[in-house]
Regions:
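Catalytic zinc-binding patch centered on the HExxH motif and its immediate surroundings
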Residues: 35-49
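Short pre-active-site segment immediately N-terminal to the catalytic Zn-binding motif
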Residues: 55-69, 134
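Active-site recognition of the HExxH zinc-binding catalytic motif
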Residues: 53, 69-77, 81-82, 142
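Acidic/histidine metal-binding catalytic segments
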Residues: 29-32, 88-91, 95, 117-119, ...
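Membrane-active amphipathic alpha-helices enriched in small hydrophobic residues
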Residues: 95-114, 118-130
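Extracytoplasmic and endomembrane cell-envelope/extracellular-matrix remodeling and assembly machinery
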Residues: 1-7, 11, 33, 128-130, ...
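Specific register positions within alpha-helical solenoid repeats of the TPR/Sel1-like families, i.e.
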Residues: 80, 253, 287, 321-324
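Catalytic Zn2+-binding segment of zinc metalloproteases
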Residues: 65, 75-92, 110
């Protein structure tokens, strides 16, 4: 897995998550998000309170509430204690599997290879079916809980449905009925049916928050620019909006066209002088050009604009400072790197 770090991505995700945590037993600080550089639509929870999100989930969404709906679903697994229940169920199922597997081994030594292999396969299938049923119940429960989380916090939960429809189009031609049967998730059509029924019984048609949608659009363009080819990016982002300019500034930077990238970013900063992420990227490009002083100035401005401690930003400015020749700057750089480690050991 290629785990990526990005302040804009992390902060926006936490902002969406925080909206969902009212009247739950979870605190935002307890949840760890990890972002995987992968174009597939996916997110999952592992032991504890760790949520993994593929970048493809964000780049293929059209509305921030689709992303928020998936977060709500994963939070519901945590709130429901599904990860711990799953561990116990796996242990229980492994105990059931042992005698069936031994029956297969005995058959081999008795000279009945076909019978033995059939027994092993039957044993594996029966155990898998037991876990499949168990997991599908958890997924259905998480869908229902996600709807409740969204509606109770005045977020339109129909976007869980629109996300599933998007996922359905992606998987329709690639997943067989047999794979659906073995899948730990219920078939998407079944999930959509349950969600539709739930939504009919709730008043959940809330308007979107325009500021969040604008933030999402910028973040999406950034991720697409960093994870797709130049041809793909320029085909998608051909206009003069902030979203278009952001993507083109990044793809120009990645292509080595630093002067073009700097010109575009300065236009963006004139339009949105309080956006810290434009300043962050500007500093990164100056650093790549070898203009360390300008890199430090812009990263310092970015840190002032986010107005909260960031381990990632402390690490970045610390790295910039230690490249300077004077000892005072190097010492300041080390201090910032220590702050980064203190926040995120």
């Amino acid at each position: 897995l290629e785990i990526i770090r990005d302040e804009e991505l992390e902060k926006f995700t936490k902002e969406l998550t925080n909206e969902l945590l009212t009247d739950t037993n979870l605190n935002l600080e307890d949840i760890n998000f990890y972002f995987i550089n992968n174009k597939e639509i996916n997110a999952f929870v592992t032991g504890g309170k760790n949520i993994f999100v593929n970048t493809g989930l964000i780049t293929q969404a059209d509305d921030y509430r689709e992303y928020q709906a998936v977060i709500a679903h994963e939070l519901s697994h945590i709130i429901g204690g599904h990860i711990f229940n799953t561990s116990a169920e796996l242990k229980n199922l492994s105990n059931k599997a042992l005698p069936v597997y031994l029956l297969g081994i005995i058959g081999i030594f008795a000279g009945s290879a076909d019978t033995a292999i059939s027994s092993i396969m039957l044993g594996q299938a029966s155990v898998q079916d037991g876990f499949t049923y168990y997991s599908r119940n958890q997924e259905a429960s998480a869908d229902q809980a996600a709807i409740n989380l969204m509606c109770s916090n005045k977020i339109n939960a129909s976007y869980l449905l629109s996300f599933l429809e998007k996922l359905d189009r992606k998987t329709l031609d690639s997943v067989s009925n047999e794979n659906y049967y073995r899948s730990t998730h219920p078939p998407i059509d079944s999930r959509k049916e349950w969600i539709n029924i739930s939504l009919k019984n709730k008043e959940c048609e809330f308007e979107n928050t325009q500021i969040l949608q604008e933030k999402f659009n910028l973040l999406k363009s950034k991720l697409i620019a960093f994870t797709h080819s130049k041809q793909e990016v320029t085909a998608i982002y051909r206009g003069d909006s902030n979203v278009d300019l952001y993507a083109n500034a990044i793809i120009s930077y990645l292509s080595g066209d630093h002067s073009v990238s700097l010109e575009i970013l300065n236009r963006l900063i004139n339009r949105e002088p309080n956006n810290p992420y434009f300043r962050e990227l500007l500093g990164e490009i100056y650093f790549a050009k070898g203009d360390f002083d300008s890199a430090i100035i812009n990263q310092s401005i970015a840190m002032e604009l986010i107005n909260e401690p960031s381990d990632l930003y402390f690490m970045m400015i610390g790295s910039y400072l230690i490249t300077l020749e004077d000892q005072i700057s190097k010492n300041d750089g080390i201090k910032n790197l220590k702050k980064s480690i203190f926040i995120n050991p």
